[in-house]
Amino acid sequence: MNIIKTNIEGVLIIEPRLFRDARGYFFESFSEREFEEKVTPILGHSVHFCQDNESMSSYGVMRGLHFQRPPYTQSKLVRCVKGRVLDVAVDIRKGSPTYGKHVAVELTEDNHVQFFIPKGFAHGFAVLSETAVFQYKCDNFYHPEADGGISILDDSLGIDWKIPTEHANLSEKDTKHAKLKDFDSPFDINVDLYL
Protein backbone atom coordinates (compact mmCIF):
# COMPACT_ATOMS: atom_id res chain seq x y z
CA MET A 1 0.00 0.00 0.00
CA ASN A 2 1.06 3.57 -0.67
CA ILE A 3 0.41 6.12 2.09
CA ILE A 4 -0.15 9.76 1.10
CA LYS A 5 -0.03 12.43 3.80
CA THR A 6 -2.50 15.30 3.39
CA ASN A 7 -2.36 18.95 4.44
CA ILE A 8 -3.80 17.97 7.85
CA GLU A 9 -1.63 15.82 10.10
CA GLY A 10 -3.03 12.33 10.67
CA VAL A 11 -5.50 12.43 7.77
CA LEU A 12 -4.20 9.93 5.23
CA ILE A 13 -4.99 8.71 1.73
CA ILE A 14 -4.17 5.04 1.19
CA GLU A 15 -3.65 3.51 -2.23
CA PRO A 16 -3.71 -0.30 -2.27
CA ARG A 17 -1.37 -2.40 -4.37
CA LEU A 18 -3.54 -3.65 -7.25
CA PHE A 19 -2.83 -6.77 -9.31
CA ARG A 20 -4.54 -6.79 -12.71
CA ASP A 21 -4.63 -9.35 -15.50
CA ALA A 22 -7.01 -10.51 -18.24
CA ARG A 23 -9.35 -11.98 -15.61
CA GLY A 24 -9.78 -8.76 -13.63
CA TYR A 25 -8.00 -7.56 -10.50
CA PHE A 26 -7.09 -8.48 -6.93
CA PHE A 27 -5.99 -6.43 -3.94
CA GLU A 28 -5.89 -6.68 -0.17
CA SER A 29 -8.47 -4.18 1.03
CA PHE A 30 -7.02 -4.36 4.55
CA SER A 31 -3.99 -5.98 6.16
CA GLU A 32 -3.53 -5.35 9.87
CA ARG A 33 0.17 -6.17 9.56
CA GLU A 34 0.78 -3.71 6.72
CA PHE A 35 -1.36 -1.04 8.41
CA GLU A 36 0.76 -1.41 11.58
CA GLU A 37 4.01 -1.29 9.59
CA LYS A 38 3.15 1.71 7.42
CA VAL A 39 0.45 3.77 9.13
CA THR A 40 1.24 3.41 12.85
CA PRO A 41 4.68 5.10 12.54
CA ILE A 42 3.05 8.10 10.82
CA LEU A 43 0.28 8.38 13.42
CA GLY A 44 2.47 7.60 16.42
CA HIS A 45 -0.06 5.11 17.81
CA SER A 46 -1.86 1.91 16.86
CA VAL A 47 -5.42 1.74 15.57
CA HIS A 48 -7.43 -1.44 16.13
CA PHE A 49 -10.59 -1.69 14.05
CA CYS A 50 -13.53 -3.57 15.59
CA GLN A 51 -16.57 -2.86 13.38
CA ASP A 52 -17.18 -2.78 9.62
CA ASN A 53 -20.17 -0.92 8.16
CA GLU A 54 -21.65 -0.62 4.68
CA SER A 55 -24.18 1.79 3.22
CA MET A 56 -25.84 2.09 -0.18
CA SER A 57 -27.03 5.51 -1.32
CA SER A 58 -28.29 7.18 -4.48
CA TYR A 59 -27.08 10.32 -6.28
CA GLY A 60 -27.23 13.47 -4.19
CA VAL A 61 -27.31 11.72 -0.82
CA MET A 62 -25.10 13.51 1.69
CA ARG A 63 -24.26 11.87 5.00
CA GLY A 64 -22.54 13.78 7.79
CA LEU A 65 -20.69 15.50 9.10
CA HIS A 66 -20.59 12.91 11.89
CA PHE A 67 -18.44 12.05 14.90
CA GLN A 68 -18.75 10.27 18.25
CA ARG A 69 -18.13 12.19 21.48
CA PRO A 70 -15.60 11.01 24.08
CA PRO A 71 -15.21 8.47 25.53
CA TYR A 72 -16.55 6.70 22.41
CA THR A 73 -14.46 8.50 19.77
CA GLN A 74 -13.84 6.74 16.46
CA SER A 75 -11.19 6.58 13.78
CA LYS A 76 -12.46 5.45 10.39
CA LEU A 77 -10.94 3.84 7.32
CA VAL A 78 -13.36 4.33 4.43
CA ARG A 79 -13.68 3.31 0.78
CA CYS A 80 -16.21 3.24 -2.04
CA VAL A 81 -16.73 -0.22 -3.54
CA LYS A 82 -19.36 0.78 -6.11
CA GLY A 83 -19.91 4.15 -7.71
CA ARG A 84 -18.28 7.43 -6.73
CA VAL A 85 -18.32 9.64 -3.63
CA LEU A 86 -16.66 12.80 -2.41
CA ASP A 87 -15.43 12.02 1.09
CA VAL A 88 -14.49 14.74 3.59
CA ALA A 89 -12.80 15.00 6.99
CA VAL A 90 -13.09 18.26 8.97
CA ASP A 91 -10.75 19.04 11.88
CA ILE A 92 -12.92 19.90 14.91
CA ARG A 93 -10.21 19.78 17.61
CA LYS A 94 -10.19 22.99 19.66
CA GLY A 95 -6.79 24.67 19.55
CA SER A 96 -5.72 22.86 16.39
CA PRO A 97 -3.92 25.04 13.82
CA THR A 98 -6.15 23.38 11.21
CA TYR A 99 -9.44 23.73 13.16
CA GLY A 100 -12.33 24.03 10.70
CA LYS A 101 -10.14 23.02 7.76
CA HIS A 102 -10.94 19.97 5.69
CA VAL A 103 -9.50 17.33 3.39
CA ALA A 104 -11.67 16.12 0.50
CA VAL A 105 -10.91 13.09 -1.63
CA GLU A 106 -12.86 11.36 -4.38
CA LEU A 107 -13.27 7.66 -3.69
CA THR A 108 -14.42 5.46 -6.56
CA GLU A 109 -14.88 1.84 -7.52
CA ASP A 110 -12.10 2.38 -10.08
CA ASN A 111 -9.40 4.10 -8.01
CA HIS A 112 -9.84 1.84 -4.92
CA VAL A 113 -8.43 4.66 -2.77
CA GLN A 114 -9.07 4.54 0.97
CA PHE A 115 -9.26 7.47 3.37
CA PHE A 116 -8.19 7.40 7.03
CA ILE A 117 -10.04 9.82 9.32
CA PRO A 118 -8.59 10.14 12.85
CA LYS A 119 -10.45 10.77 16.08
CA GLY A 120 -11.32 14.43 16.58
CA PHE A 121 -12.60 14.91 13.04
CA ALA A 122 -16.11 15.16 11.61
CA HIS A 123 -16.69 12.92 8.61
CA GLY A 124 -19.14 12.96 5.74
CA PHE A 125 -19.61 12.15 2.08
CA ALA A 126 -21.72 12.99 -0.95
CA VAL A 127 -22.75 10.50 -3.63
CA LEU A 128 -21.68 11.65 -7.10
CA SER A 129 -22.78 8.58 -9.09
CA GLU A 130 -26.23 7.08 -9.70
CA THR A 131 -25.69 4.84 -6.67
CA ALA A 132 -22.75 4.16 -4.38
CA VAL A 133 -21.82 1.42 -1.95
CA PHE A 134 -19.63 2.76 0.83
CA GLN A 135 -17.69 0.72 3.39
CA TYR A 136 -15.95 1.85 6.53
CA LYS A 137 -13.98 0.33 9.35
CA CYS A 138 -14.26 1.85 12.85
CA ASP A 139 -12.04 1.44 15.90
CA ASN A 140 -14.94 1.82 18.35
CA PHE A 141 -18.47 0.49 18.33
CA TYR A 142 -21.44 2.71 17.51
CA HIS A 143 -22.85 4.46 20.59
CA PRO A 144 -26.01 6.41 19.70
CA GLU A 145 -25.84 8.39 22.94
CA ALA A 146 -22.46 9.81 21.82
CA ASP A 147 -23.60 10.63 18.28
CA GLY A 148 -22.75 14.14 17.12
CA GLY A 149 -22.41 16.24 14.01
CA ILE A 150 -21.90 19.60 12.36
CA SER A 151 -23.80 20.89 9.35
CA ILE A 152 -22.69 19.32 6.09
CA LEU A 153 -24.05 22.38 4.24
CA ASP A 154 -22.10 24.96 6.29
CA ASP A 155 -20.68 27.32 3.64
CA SER A 156 -18.00 28.54 6.05
CA LEU A 157 -16.25 25.16 5.72
CA GLY A 158 -15.52 25.93 2.07
CA ILE A 159 -16.33 22.42 0.84
CA ASP A 160 -17.28 22.01 -2.82
CA TRP A 161 -19.50 18.94 -2.65
CA LYS A 162 -19.83 18.80 -6.47
CA ILE A 163 -23.61 18.53 -6.11
CA PRO A 164 -26.10 21.35 -6.76
CA THR A 165 -27.80 22.26 -3.47
CA GLU A 166 -31.22 21.50 -4.96
CA HIS A 167 -30.12 17.87 -5.50
CA ALA A 168 -28.78 17.40 -1.95
CA ASN A 169 -30.63 14.65 -0.08
CA LEU A 170 -30.08 14.72 3.70
CA SER A 171 -31.62 12.83 6.60
CA GLU A 172 -33.77 14.87 8.96
CA LYS A 173 -31.12 14.40 11.66
CA ASP A 174 -28.35 15.79 9.43
CA THR A 175 -30.37 18.92 8.61
CA LYS A 176 -30.40 19.83 12.33
CA HIS A 177 -26.66 19.88 13.03
CA ALA A 178 -25.16 23.23 14.08
CA LYS A 179 -22.85 25.25 11.88
CA LEU A 180 -19.21 25.37 12.94
CA LYS A 181 -19.52 28.92 14.37
CA ASP A 182 -22.30 27.73 16.71
CA PHE A 183 -20.63 24.44 17.60
CA ASP A 184 -18.94 23.66 20.93
CA SER A 185 -16.50 20.90 20.08
CA PRO A 186 -15.94 18.08 22.59
CA PHE A 187 -12.40 17.62 21.21
CA ASP A 188 -9.19 19.43 22.16
CA ILE A 189 -5.84 19.23 20.37
CA ASN A 190 -4.12 18.89 23.78
CA VAL A 191 -6.09 15.77 24.76
CA ASP A 192 -4.77 12.51 23.31
CA LEU A 193 -7.85 10.61 22.14
CA TYR A 194 -5.84 7.42 21.64
CA LEU A 195 -4.87 6.88 25.31
Go through the PLM ranges and name each one.
Residues 1-110, 131, 138-195:
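Non-catalytic, conserved peripheral segments adjacent to functional cores
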Residues 107-131:
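Conserved metal-binding segment of the jelly-roll/cupin
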